[in-house]
Amino acid sequence: VDGRIKPVRDGGRVTASFILRPYRVADEDAAIALWQRTWQEAYPSIDFAARVAWWRVRWREELVPNAAIIVAEQDGVLAGFVTIDPSGYLDQLVVDSRHWGSELASTLVDAAKQRAPDGITLLVNKDNGRAIRFYLRCGFKQAGEDVNPTSGRPVLKMIWTP
């Protein structure tokens, strides 16, 4: 995460270039809006607009002080981010849906792996087959089932070890 431009491929061709950099406080509104929009697209039956106030508190009080947040920016616009805490827990991987299917998400996961050389754990909604397949392609393994303590939804625990 050095501010270098990272080309992202889609089907073998370079489609866009992104700058990966550390999160800045000025990114808060864009990051929260991106979180809401992408989760709403992934789970249209859930009212994520109603959760924005809760998410802003969680973002400010839990993630920003305790995790490395790496953002991907294209032409000055936030296109994605990943959070990784010192224990190697990946809480959020958020990518603008316009870049779903590109290599942007795996580029962000690779940045998280650099921050967590001993390994990464994460929870993924059990009904999110697309995300599960993505994490498997990134080298993660399933390591059990659980229930998300916040949403009550069934989740899979996944781990990556170097």
Listing of model-derived features with the role each one plays in the protein:
Residues 90-100, 124-125:
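A short, internal acetyl-CoA/4′-phosphopantetheine-binding micro-motif in the GNAT/acyltransferase core
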Residues 115-127:
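Conserved GNAT acetyl-CoA-binding A-motif
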Residues 58-71, 89:
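A short helix-loop-beta-strand connector motif used in the catalytic cores of GNAT acetyltransferases and
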Residues 71, 77-94:
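Conserved beta-strand in the GNAT
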Residues 28, 32-59:
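Conserved GNAT-fold acetyl-CoA-binding loop/helix
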Residues 1-26, 160:
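Conserved N-terminal entry element of GNAT/NAT acetyltransferase domains
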Residues 106, 127-144, 150-153:
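Conserved active-site alpha-helix within GNAT-family acetyltransferase domains
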